[in-house]
UniProtKB/Swiss-Prot annotation:
Enzyme nomenclature, EC number: 3.2.1.139
Gene3D superfamilies reported for this sequence: Alpha-glucuronidase, C-terminal domain, Chitobiase/beta-hexosaminidase domain 2-like, Glycosidases
Subcellular compartments: Secreted
Species this chain originates from: Aspergillus niger (strain ATCC MYA-4892 / CBS 513.88 / FGSC A1513)
Annotated GO MF terms: alpha-glucuronidase activity
Signal peptide as annotated in the record: 1-20
Family: Belongs to the glycosyl hydrolase 67 family.
Highest taxon of source: Eukaryota
Protein's job: Alpha-glucuronidase involved in the hydrolysis of xylan, a major structural heterogeneous polysaccharide found in plant biomass representing the second most abundant polysaccharide in the biosphere, after cellulose. Releases 4-O-methylglucuronic acid from xylan.
InterPro entries assigned to the protein according to its UniProt record, in alphabetical order: A-glucoronidase_C_sf, Glyco_hydro_67_aGlcAse, Glyco_hydro_67_aGlcAse_N, Glyco_hydro_67_C, Glyco_hydro_67_cat, Glycoside_hydrolase_SF, Hex-like_dom2
UniProt-recorded name of the protein: Probable alpha-glucuronidase A
């Protein structure tokens, strides 16, 4: 007994010595869990593989099981020749092979990729409908073991839909459009990279969440991918992914016959064009015999398409679909088609109507291997949108939902935003087609309209950063996407808790803290960026990152708010607006047509109302804006305190990396809060009843300080500076000093400095109080892997804050900041804030 206690003590000490990790293994860390001798003896000690050929998913399953048991339990699983009744073994096989070799087994009907998992102590059977399903079952069992779940189970599970793909927007030069985790793992300098190790690891992660295909290149495709040398490169990518049951697909440029093939047309009905594409497809399948198919973006945002020749979208899609049919390939055709030169003066103009207008009348005209890939909302991955009505308008056409793991409009992985609760607002939405239950999840699976093909696509955009997405916590979104694509009725919080256990361990405080932070994160981000259905009030013209609400209007992009001095919101009603509500089935349209029945969180999406309109909550629209933005920023600051409570419970490398992002998010949430509130206060003249907006008693505006070598600078947009003005050095190669006498009472304060970190320079600042240097820092965010879209301008994208905690000051002390310009960055400063510890200004 005493020996066992000593063993447990040593094991606990070893487990407490948290080793440094960089995130490369994601949720497949296979971290050790406690398992005493009795526990070990109750688990399998052998692995048995049936029909395991070299490079097959079943061989991969055996390798993963061995590696997992060794790492998790320090158990060496030995291979054993196949026997039907192997004891103390994990048996992995396809169901058909097992039935041929052994007795029949009572297993429920499985769909392709499905599996049966039976665990009875030291005997485990994993039977897949196919080899890929068997691999999925192995990962399922390993996930149980990694979470110290040794319970007896016996169940079958099949995928919600056959298509469970990820999209990468990787360019041939190695950049990634809307990617925030480093350069491409697939391409560099116009060709496919040599090193396939990251590709294999990515495929491994995807297989573990049951993703079955990757589209490896940008939807804004470069035709040079179709050159013979790049086809050879695609073959190497496919070879790296194949052992994990992950197929590859590619995006196509519609004009390739002209751009690459030397034809004078890309008309989809031209016989020469048809022959050219068939030849290209034949060649691709020579290099990649199991290629999943194509993804096409056409007639959208400058991309060529069939409309050039007055052909329909279905005629364009069918060109590729027919070329793929002999090989069983799928054509994913994006529904993201709209006019980006709309006339805002036309009250009826509405980009949100475009998808239904373009596709509804073509229903039933697409080939059976065409799937229309529909964004979850009718605009573009906003913080909240209503469900795209196109899902309700295609009875005779296969559909898939398009989600975005990459946080293009949602903080670009620099802000914690756990996305499944957002996705579930669409997946669980009942469109009531023909007055019958019509959940979006049942439409994309094919169940509602009796379609055999359909499913899921997500824009992921992993890169060479060891965290894959740039942020450790952002990986929860990729994990959850795979889980939901398999089983969309799973609860967001349960998925999150499973991911946390696999990624950060079994500590209950860690699990509860990360769960609470993450489940709060989307509402918080919505609060401080754009609420009531107004969309994300970011800069839609360039970065899609920082606040810039003015860019929503006065252009042809159609993401309008129609905000003015008196009122705000898009009137999308039938009776007085764009008629968008009429694209929904009758029961849904009736809800959104009425201001009284429209939920508050979408009121500005569907209705144009006075700023003084009272919501169902009883609060006016403008006051809701003010309140929500303050609440959101307060929540973001809470994330830092919550994360800091995990110090010592998470390895130092991941703890510090994530803490720095959360600190940044807290500061940037203040930038967002003030920019949006100041913009609309300036527009409406309606004050905040709580007296917060425009009143910051703890701040010292930089332009009010004594300046030497600094000059004032009027920031544009004005709301991106606390008092519309910042200071910059008089040249880009000089030093400036700003000083002031502290008027605050003596005491201990947190000193925050809001400044601008521009791309293309690394200014240096030194903060002093009295005769003591408080701290120094560099404007080097472009080099410290923060990863968001950079900016060379003073604005909401480059604005940020650094805080020095627990600084003792005396009233009358001189506060001084010395800024040394570098490159294009003139050491810009906005304001200093002196806060009693724990207060959010």
């Amino acid at each position: 007994m005493r020996g066992l206690n000593l063993f447990q003590l040593i094991l606990a000490l070893l487990l407490s010595m948290v080793a440094a990790e960089d995130g490369y293994d994601g949720w497949l860390r296979y971290a050790p869990v406690s398992c005493d001798l009795h526990c070990q003896q109750a688990l399998p000690s052998h692995v048995v593989l049936l029909n395991s050929t070299k490079g097959s998913p079943i061989e991969t399953a055996g390798r993963e099981l061995k590696a997992g048991f060794q790492s998790i339990l320090s158990t060496n699983l030995t291979s054993r020749p196949f026997q039907c009744n192997s004891s103390a073994s994990i048996l992995v096989a396809t169901l058909d092979e097992y039935r041929q070799r052994c007795r029949d087994i009572n297993v429920p009907e499985l769909d392709p990729d499905g599996f049966w998992l039976q665990s009875e102590g030291d005997t485990v059977r994993i039977l897949g409908k196919d080899a890929r399903g068997a691999l999925y079952g192995a990962y399922e069992y390993l996930a149980m073991v990694a979470q110290r779940n040794f319970s007896r189970v016996a169940y079958a599970t099949s995928p919600h839909a056959p298509i469970r793909w990820v999209n990468q927007w990787d360019n041939m030069d190695g950049s990634i459009e809307r990617g925030y985790g480093g350069a491409s793992i697939f391409f560099k300098d116009g060709t496919v990279v040599e090193d396939m190790a990251p590709v294999e690891q990515y495929a491994r992660l995807l297989a573990s969440i049951r993703i079955n295909a990757i589209v490896v290149n940008n939807v804004n495709a470069n035709a040079t991918l179709l050159l013979p040398e790049n086809m050879k490169g695609l073959s190497r990518i496919a070879d790296a992914c194949r052992p994990y049951g992950v197929q590859i697909g590619i995006s196509l440029n519609f004009a390739s016959p002209e751009a690459l093939g030397g034809l004078n047309t890309y008309d989809p009905l031209d016989p020469g064009v048809i022959a050219w594409w068939q030849n290209i497809t034949d060649s691709l399948y020579t290099y990649v015999p199991d290629m999943a198919g194509y993804l096409v973006k056409a007639d959208s945002e400058g991309q060529p398409g069939p409309d050039t020749y007055n052909r329909t979208l279905s005629q364009g899609a069918n060109l590729f679909a027919r070329a793929l049919q002999p090989y069983g390939g799928v054509l994913m055709y994006r529904a993201f088609v709209y006019d980006d030169n709309l006339n805002e003066s036309d009250w009826k103009a509405d980009r949100a109507k475009a998808a239904v207008e373009y596709f509804k009348d073509l229903d039933g005209q697409f080939e059976e291997n065409v799937v229309i890939q529909i964004k979850y909302g009718p605009i573009d991955f906003q913080v909240r949108e209503p469900t795209s009505p196109l899902f309700a308008n295609l009875y005779h056409t296969n559909t898939a939902i398009e989600l975005e793991v990459s946080q293009e409009y949602l903080g670009q992985q620099c802000h914690l935003v756990y996305l499944p609760p957002l996705w579930k607002t669409v997946l669980d939405f009942d469109l009531r087609v023909d007055h019958k239950p019509s959940m979006v999840r049942d439409i994309i699976s094919g169940q509602r309209f009796n379609r055999t093909l359909g499913g899921w696509a997500a824009v992921v955009n992993v890169g060479t950063n060891r965290t894959w997405l740039g942020s450790h916590l952002a990986m929860s979104n990729l994990y959850a996407y795979g889980r939901l694509a398999w089983s969309p009725t799973d609860e967001s919080e349960q998925i999150l808790e499973d991911w946390t256990r696999l990624t950060f361990g079994q500590n209950h405080h860690v699990i509860n803290t990360i769960s609470d932070m993450s489940m709060t994160s989307w509402p918080a981000y919505e609060n401080y960026t754009g609420n009531l259905g107004i969309q994300t009030l970011t800069d839609i013209l360039y970065t899609h990152y920082g606040p810039n609400p003015a860019t929503q209007d006065n252009n042809g992009w159609g993401q309008w708010t129609r905000a003015d001095h008196d009122s705000v919101g898009m009137d999308r009603t039938i009776w007085n607006g764009t008629g968008y509500t009429g694209q929904y089935p009758e029961e849904v349209a009736r809800v959104y047509e009425s201001l009284e029945s429209t939920p508050d969180d979408l009121v500005l999406w569907f209705h144009h109302v006075p700023w003084t309109h009272r919501l169902h909550s009883g609060v006016t629209v403008i006051q809701h804006f003010y309140n929500a933005h303050y609440a959101g920023a307060e929540a973001a600051h809470g994330f830092v305190r919550q994360w800091e409570s995990l110090e010592g419970l998470i390895d130092r490398e991941r703890y510090e990396a994530m803490r720095s992002r959360l600190v940044y998010q807290a500061g940037h949430s203040i930038v967002w809060r003030d920019a949006i509130n100041n913009f609309y206060y300036n527009m409406t003249g309606i004050p905040d009843v709580a007296g917060r907006v425009g009143h910051h008693p703890w701040r010292i505006e930089a332009e009010s300080m004594g300046l030497d070598g600094y000059q004032t600078y009027t920031v544009s947009p004005f709301e991106a500076a606390s008092n519309t003005t910042a200071i910059i050095t008089t040249s880009n190669s000089t030093t400036g000093t700003a000083r002031t006498s502290i008027k605050a009472p003596s005491g201990v304060y947190d000193i925050g400095v809001n400044y601008y970190d521009l791309y293309g320079g690394q200014s240096k600042w030194t903060l002093s109080v009295g005769d003591k240097v408080v701290g120094q820092w560099l404007g080097d965010m472009e080099h410290n892997s923060l990863g968001h879209t950079p900016s060379i301008y003073l604005g909401g994208h480059s604005a940020t804050r650094i805080t020095f905690h627990g600084v003792g000051i005396r009233q009358g002390d001189q506060l001084k900041i010395v800024g040394e310009a570098n490159g294009v960055e003139p050491a810009p400063l906005d304001y200093i804030v002196l806060l009693p510890p724990g207060l959010v200004d």
